[in-house]
């Protein structure tokens, strides 16, 4: 049976050697690919100009905290009660807003946004506290957390153009089953994905699975664990069962529930779509890299008011803000 730790470590050492031996190597991440998919100008600001910004926001901050606490819970370094305590300590002392009311000058509007921020924070907090309070580790023969994997794109596409490109990423959780297959789980503190957003983010896990499959592992399942949600189980007298995804804060004390793990179909069709996602966006990167000295504000911008104002760290230096 394949040794999970040894094979992952060997893969990581190979990547280190590639970086040393090929100074032109471009190490791609899902974040880079999704950034250029969203906006080429944002990509240039971030990955070519390397403009320093405070890229943290309430979601990245609390997401990182949740990942850290889950790691410690799986390693039995903290108890459920301690995880709840640490979560509450951090969320109550953080400087980030769910809805930023601090820049609004109109008093009535500020009060409205302040109340909205309080509501979002309370709901989010109740969901996550219930997650940590009810945390139960999934049982595996072995597991790894927060491990880097990679694959050479010239081997994937069999094209010389990609010889200086590799895809890599850090997998939240890899679980080894008794039959030697593996599960890939990504923890999410966000709202559940739907539509195009679900399709886009599925590529991340599919690409991680391709990396691990290339190492010789058989993929059993891949999916997200949406931490704010639970899968409510309702059993009927006729033997039928109904499963409903609900926010954890809505659960009653006697409700039966399980983690809300949303699986992604890992099949040939979806693998092709994920690889096309890489192929198309690497071509965009190549074209932008060729004009790296060009004024970034002359690079095409995919303007979206909500995204630009709330999620893009470069809004204030981008000419769309003027």
Predicted segments with their positions:
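RecB-family 4Fe-4S metal-dependent nuclease core
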Residues: 1-322
